[in-house]
Amino acid sequence: MKILIASNTAWYLWKFRLSLAQALRAAGHEVVAVAPRDGYAPKLAEAGIRFVDVPMDNAGTSPARDLLFLFRLLRLLRREQPGVYLGYTIKPNVYGGMACRWLGIPSIHNVSGLGTAFMKKGALSRIACLLYRTGLGRATRVFFQNNEDRSEFVGLGLVPATVTAVLPGSGVDLDRFAPRAGPSREDPGPVRFILFARLIWDKGIGEYVAAARQLQREGLAAKFQLAGFLEVKNRTAVSRTDVDSWVREGVVDYLGETDDVRSWMAQADCVVLPSYREGTPRSLLEAASMAKPVIAADAPGCRNAVKDGVSGFL
């Protein structure tokens, strides 16, 4: 069977869905990765996954650009004639679902978090509901990463309950993210906190910096580190100016970006994620796999990854 796997970035497919794509290929299926081309498209090709570039305006709200993306998906699906479409991230879910509905192609979607549009009620949330209802209303199956997100979608009438299921997260390779033997680092030094995330305000970056500033004022011997993609295409992106200002102030250290967080996580004493809302956060699963305590917001998704008072604190 030919299976199309679509996302808003090739990076996402390489980072989170490569093992799935390889398992499907090993089972005898033909797998096609669909996303806008970025620096990770060649990595997918090197792994044996055929990549198709479908440009899209990932974070924009232009109806014209979104209609163009829908047209590109329709054209691709007609040409490829897949047996099933797997959709990840917002626009490939919404517009991929619409295209599959019109062409009679089975579609399976993974809603990994509800995002900014569902945090505040208003025009944006009403438009998001309309798009999701149209895109996912006839889906073959829709997976959510926590029960709260599933209940909200079903309660709003966006998807029938009968096609929904909860798949708690993307999973973690326990062999790759294994606890390190011995001390976490050579020098005891101050306590090290680290936050791994795309640098957007919804991840609680502002709260993390404010907490770091307050604890430093109180005299706590600690280092506060940030790691993740900066200047992402998102309405709530943290600016480089803000990060540079915090670094100059001495409140946080910005480590940059990496494809492998294990060495940084191994050096940390505690992993922090004060996010406003998540599906099931991968960084907390990876931290738990490496036996690192965590501090997370008592918010949808985060609370599913932490046993309060045992593996960390909410």
Question: What are the language-model segments listed below?
Answer:
Residues 35-39, 196, 223-238:
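Glycosyltransferase donor-sugar binding loop
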Residues 52, 133-180:
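Donor nucleotide-sugar binding/catalytic pocket of nucleotide-sugar-dependent glycosyltransferases
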Residues 262, 269, 291:
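A short alpha->beta transition loop at the rim of the catalytic pocket in nucleotide-sugar-dependent
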Residues 293-296, 306:
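Short hydrophobic beta-strand element within catalytic cores of glycosyltransferases
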